[in-house]
Amino acid sequence: MKKNLYPTIAILCLVPFIMVLGNSMLIPVLPKIQEELHVGLVQVGFLITVFSIPAGIVIPFAGMLSDRIGRKKIMFPALLIYGIGGLLAGLFAILFKEKAFPWIIGARIIQGIGAGGTYQLGMALAGDLIQSNERSKVLGLLEAFNGLGKVVSPLAGAAIALISWYMPFFVYGVLAIPIGFLVLWVVSEDVKKLKQQVQPIPKYFGDLAKIFKSKGLALATAFLSGLLALFALFGLLSFFSDVLEKQFKISIFPRGLILGIPVLIMALTAYILGTVMQKQMTRILKWAAVIGLFMLAAGLILFCPFKNLWGLTIAASILGLGTGAVLPSLNTLITSSAPKTERGLVTCLYGTVRFFGVAIGPPLFGLAEKISKPPIFFTTAGICILAGVLFLFLVDPKKIIPKEIQS
């Protein structure tokens, strides 16, 4: 990789880090928010949902537009909107106190709209810049920073919430707005070359249709796998946070430390796998995704019978290990499935299904408190196993990833 790209890659790594704070930093604080705003577990889970659904809706439009005008022109205002939404949520909490819940929901929607133009465009830009087998390493690095954000955010959220439960909302603005300006001033992008490659709208969608016609089953399987990984991870973490508070009476900061264990394992796995895939990409990629999906299922199944803290943490860590194996494999597969002219939209469609997984995970897993764990946990595990089998038979990385990236 060219040395002049190092600052760009460093800034791009900050984008998934800040984006993942959007949900992960709130997870250990949800029980406290529940108490302060007098809402139930399912309701408080909607703080995650109303952030993730707008992000998921915006992502494909942001991707399509970025294919035509450039990635930075979307990422910069998106990061500003993301930060402003967080600042508004904190201000509403101060102004309206125990009646602030609907106002915070509105601010989270604004924040989600901003989030829709961040991480996936960072992935697409990394894919534009790295035209060699180093792409898997760089994408693994981005996913590792995404994972690092998931590790740091429960600890940061728990620590900052010791000041007040609404203080984590202000962190979004303090971090996202400066990072937005770094993207604008530091990140390099060949917009002139991108504009030369811009196609008329009918040809753009025609070429996109050809991609899905030739690789549709494989891409659909990859999209499903990404949705399941994030659905299971965020669903389990939000449920585990509630269990730690109510069943084990663990205070907010130690709770953040415990929740950080599975996501630390996920981040380390993503980074190591991204590095290893450089040497034997097509062989390792497929088996990493399949085994990762089976590990997701194993973590969910094991979480049900365990009653002690160690057992539950081990089960959650197995799920984290599986997520860390699945996501970098999917990132490389999907960013390499389309040429530069359509990469933004294809990558962002993948981001949409990831966000929908995050959106529905916490409220659906929250229902386990009212009914019981096995129906939700075992059903999700079964779908993960099915996705693993589909990936095994329907996805051939050699047919999807260009030869110059494989070698």
Residue ranges and their predicted role:
Residues 49-63, 260-272:
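Central cavity-lining transmembrane alpha-helices of secondary-active solute carriers
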Residues 1-2, 188-221:
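Juxtamembrane intracellular "pre-TM" segments in multi-pass secondary transporters
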Residues 218-260:
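Extracytoplasmic gate region of multi-pass secondary transporters
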Residues 59-71, 270-283:
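Helix-to-loop junctions at the C-terminal end of transmembrane segments
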Residues 57-97:
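Conserved MFS/SLC helix-loop-helix module at the cytosolic interface between two early adjacent transmembrane helices
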Residues 141-187:
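Helix-loop-helix hairpin linking two adjacent transmembrane segments in secondary transporters
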Residues 74-88, 286-301:
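Structural signature of the two symmetry-related core transmembrane helices
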Residues 101, 107-146:
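Cytoplasmic helix-loop-helix junction between adjacent transmembrane helices
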